[in-house]
């Protein structure tokens, strides 16, 4: 276990990139039992292995601040105002990279271990839906691995569900209607 008194995380994401910026770290999706447990500031930011902050609002996309973990990057500007941090090119690249890595990991689990994703979906759904609403690029990627659950508890990818309902739920303009 990562923490002795905590439940196993749903899954990990390893970060390691040297170009166009330098970044290492590990992020993980915690298991959420109820809404009271959702807390931010669980990602610690380091610069050259020196603790900087656990407020990573500008570095980690808003919908991913619910993740836990550690990020280390010598390319984060220090001793600057928040407005400068927001406009720093490396910070924007790091944010985009983290979003892509999360989407890639979820897609990998969907393709290779779909049963595992279905078992964990109720815990992940909150993160993924929030991300789809707040980040267009993440939404485009998430359309591949996002799951829908029917009343019988069976999971469908959006594409599978569309194929299932297409014959019965197509309007006169030939568009599928999701109910």
What are these regions (language model features)?
Residues 1-178:
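Conserved GHKL (Bergerat-fold) ATPase module
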């Amino acid at each position: 276990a990562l923490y002795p008194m905590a439940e196993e995380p749903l899954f990990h994401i390893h970060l390691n990139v040297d170009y166009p910026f330098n970044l290492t770290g590990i992020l993980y999706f915690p298991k959420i039992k109820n809404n009271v447990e959702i807390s931010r500031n669980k990602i610690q930011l380091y610069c050259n292995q020196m603790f900087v902050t656990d407020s990573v609002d500008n570095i980690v996309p808003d919908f991913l601040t619910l993740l836990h973990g550690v990020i280390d990057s010598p390319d984060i500007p220090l001793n600057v105002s928040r407005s400068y941090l927001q406009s720093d090119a490396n910070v924007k690249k790091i944010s985009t990279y983290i979003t892509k890595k999360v989407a890639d990991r979820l897609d990998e689990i969907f393709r290779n271990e779909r049963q595992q994703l279905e078992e964990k979906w109720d815990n992940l759904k909150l993160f993924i839906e929030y991300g789809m609403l707040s980040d267009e690029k993440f939404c485009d990627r998430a359309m591949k691995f996002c799951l829908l659950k029917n009343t019988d508890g069976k999971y469908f990818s959006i594409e599978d569900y569309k194929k299932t309902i297409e014959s019965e739920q197509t309007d006169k303009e030939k568009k599928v209607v999701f109910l």
